[in-house]
Structure formats: C-alpha cells, structure tokens
Amino acid sequence: MSNLTVITHPLVQHKLTLMRRKDASSNSFRRLLGELSQLMAYEVTRDMPLSPVQIETPLETMTGQMIDGKKLVLVSILRAGNGFLDGMLNVVPGARVGHIGLYRDPATLQAVEYYFKMPAGIDERDTIVVDPMLATGNSAVACMARLKQLKPRSIKFVCLLAVPEGIARLQQAHPDVSIFTAAIDRELNEHGYILPGLGDAGDRIFGTK
C-alpha cells in the first residue's frame, strides 16, 4: 500500500464532511469540491521537480526555484472529474488538460470508453488523473491502460473517496500508479456505489438525476 496516500489534513476532512451531507446544494457541493481539489493538489504535487530560475527582487538578483507546469497534464474522467479541474488549475495554471469519457455498463459494471482527447507530447509529461470516486476501480483501470498507450512519464490518480476493493483492483492492475484520496469508505453496495459515500458525484455537481 506504499503507493496509497490518504490526505487527512483537518481542512480536507472538514470540507469532505460538508460535501457528504445530503442537504448540500449543487452550488455548495461544487464550491467545496473546488476548495478540496486545491487543498489536495498541495499534497499531490509535493514531489514535483523544481528548476533554478534567476529573478530580480526589488533589492537584488537571486536564484529561485520554480516548477514547470507545462510538464504536467491533468486528465479528467468525464464528467465528474471536471469538478476537480478548476481547483487544481488554480494551483498549477500552466498544466495542460486532457479528457477521457467512460461510462459504467449497468449490467456488467465494466467501463466503456466513448471519448479520448489528450494534449500533444504526453510522453514528456507527468499526468494526474482526477475522478471523485474510486469504486469498483474498473473506470480507473481502463483509463490507466488507455493513457499508458501514450507512455506518459508518470501517472497519479486522485479521488475524494475510495473503497478497499477499488484500491486493490487499481493497485493489482497498475502497481506503478500512485493513489491519493481524502477518505477510504467501508464498502460498495450491490449497485457498485460507495457506502457511506456522498451519492453520485456527477449528479451532485451538475444538479442532475
């Protein structure tokens, strides 16, 4: 489990609890997700490489350290993953953005791809995949397999909630992918939804049923 990080910062846990409440409006849910994604981005980007840069302060010249956001790609698993993007782009505005569309077959719970669009040169970039939920793990596994065809430099997966079976599925299929989550919930129900969970993240973000 060395590639699994649970982000336990008090602000993360506070905002996640507010999001879980069934009476949270779509507006509140979106706002909280944006705030949470910024907080989680701090931990997820902790090991990003720095490059020396010469700058002028008001008093003298110095050498500072900067990250190269242009070497980073954020990949949203549609549609709920889009809720993560604004917050993360606030932290790393130079990042490129890709999208993969996957839907879950209600009969088999397997992921079916319907859209895939990535920036050029992904083989020279580190990649962060965002999706609020790691449930069965099927969508995450399918996404990683598709991304690896483009040979990105590295892949991280970021979610709000995960369950043990989803974590195990992703780790077994892609042990090189680092997983970041705000919480590990108890289990999946018979329909593949996380318990206690927070409901359908996409519906709650966009106010749909």
Swiss-Prot record:
Record comment: activity regulation: Allosterically activated by GTP.
Signal peptide residues on this chain, from the entry's feature table: none
Cofactor note: Binds 1 Mg(2+) ion per subunit. The magnesium is bound as Mg-PRPP.
Annotated pathway: Pyrimidine metabolism; UMP biosynthesis via salvage pathway; UMP from uracil: step 1/1
Gene3D superfamilies xrefs: 3.40.50.2020
Entries under InterPro entries matching the protein: PRibTrfase_dom, PRTase-like, Upp_B, UPRTase/APRTase, Ura_phspho_trans
Gene Ontology molecular function: any one: magnesium ion binding
Source organism superkingdom: Bacteria
Binding of uracil, residues: I194, G199, D200, A201
Residues given in the record as 5-phospho-alpha-D-ribose 1-diphosphate binding sites: R79, R104, D131, P132, M133, L134, A135, T136, G137, N138, S139, D200
Keyword set, alphabetical order: Allosteric enzyme, Glycosyltransferase, GTP-binding, Magnesium, Nucleotide-binding, Transferase
Pfam families noted in UniProt: UPRTase (PF14681)
PANTHER family: ADENINE PHOSPHORIBOSYLTRANSFERASE, URACIL PHOSPHORIBOSYLTRANSFERASE, CHLOROPLASTIC
Family membership: Belongs to the UPRTase family.
Purpose of the protein: Catalyzes the conversion of uracil and 5-phospho-alpha-D-ribose 1-diphosphate (PRPP) to UMP and diphosphate.
The name this protein goes by in its record: Uracil phosphoribosyltransferase
Native organism: Verminephrobacter eiseniae (strain EF01-2)
